[in-house]
Regions:
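A penicillin-recognizing enzyme superfamily signal
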Residues: 5-9, 52-224, 229-233
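Amphipathic repeat-derived elements
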Residues: 21, 71, 75, 198-200, ...
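Low-complexity, Gly/Ser/Thr/Pro-rich intrinsically disordered linker/tail segments
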Residues: 209-266
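Active-site-adjacent helix/loop patches that line small-molecule binding or acyl-intermediate pockets
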Residues: 1-67, 113
Length: 266
């Protein structure tokens, strides 16, 4: 299975196999490089969201994609002016390159699959989000944490729904059911406010170094439709199911579990 398809449909066996290839400690070290300051435990489940991480940390890590490899440190105040509009202080975030722009663009294209035909495919039709956007849903054991981190060429935002006590489940609290609607409504309001200067039809620019190259691994409608057929997907974690239905796919993984072997992911 291609990674773009596994990512779009949250097929976590693929994620675990990639972790095994790169190494758990390397994964943890790279996460720290992206601004994750919370404790990360070197277990296989670390790649599936087993550790508690704040929304701002996750958002900072994701900024490397729409910023084409650049990971800025979040700041809350950009400038200070006096009552007459004179600039007193200007603040510029620290910026560092963590991946190259080609890798970042490929990840953007892959993550667009989540919104086009993956677990987040209800985002555009349900909330009227226009233009290109990419993101990822996330759900932990017993649906105690629901995530959606998404971005457009101009703006990135994240939503988390859950409890301090992670043993409390939410029933239908999967990422696309509980967190993605918050993100969708937020962006819908941004699009409707002309004062913000938000361009809803803006597109992700292809790096100049890739011009003339065949973007064979880009996410497109046909490939994802084929992926859905191959996976026999009839319900995703975003389907608004009856409360009596069994919940959709979640990231159930025991920290002691070493994962499963599947030659299709190698």
């Amino acid at each position: 299975m291609q990674m773009k398809k596994a990512l779009a449909w949250s097929k976590n066996n693929a994620t675990v196999n990639i972790l095994k290839m790169v190494g758990i400690q390397h994964f943890v070290d790279f996460a720290k490089k992206l601004g994750i300051v919370s404790d990360l435990h070197a277990f296989p489940s670390v790649c599936l969201g087993a550790d508690a991480i704040s929304v701002i940390e996750m958002m900072r890590a994701y900024t490397m994609f729409p910023n084409y490899g650049i990971n800025p440190k979040p700041i809350y105040i950009t400038r200070i002016e006096d009552r007459n509009g004179n600039l007193l202080e200007n603040f510029v975030p620290e910026r560092k390159e963590v991946i190259n722009e080609v890798t970042a663009f490929k990840m953007i294209r892959m993550m667009m699959g989540t919104v086009l035909f993956g677990t987040g495919r209800r985002l555009k039709p349900a909330y009227g989000v226009e233009g290109e956007c990419a993101g990822k849903t996330g759900t932990t054991n017993s649906e105690s944490d629901a995530w959606f981190i998404g971005y457009t060429p101009q703006l990135l935002a994240g939503a988390w729904v859950g409890c301090d006590d992670r043993f409390i489940g939410e029933g239908l609290g999967e990422g696309a059911r509980a967190a993605m609607p918050i993100w969708g409504l937020f962006f819908k309001r941004i699009q409707a406010d002309n004062k913000l200067g938000y361009n809803a039809i803006d597109k992700f620019d292809k790096p100049s170094i890739m011009e003339g190259l065949d973007e064979c691994d880009a996410v497109d409608e046909i490939s994802l439709q084929r992926a859905a057929a191959q996976l026999n997907v009839t319900r995703g974690e975003d389907d608004m199911a009856d409360p009596n239905d069994e919940p959709g796919e979640t990231n159930k993984f025991d920290p002691a579990d070493k994962g499963t072997e599947d030659n299709d992911y190698k």
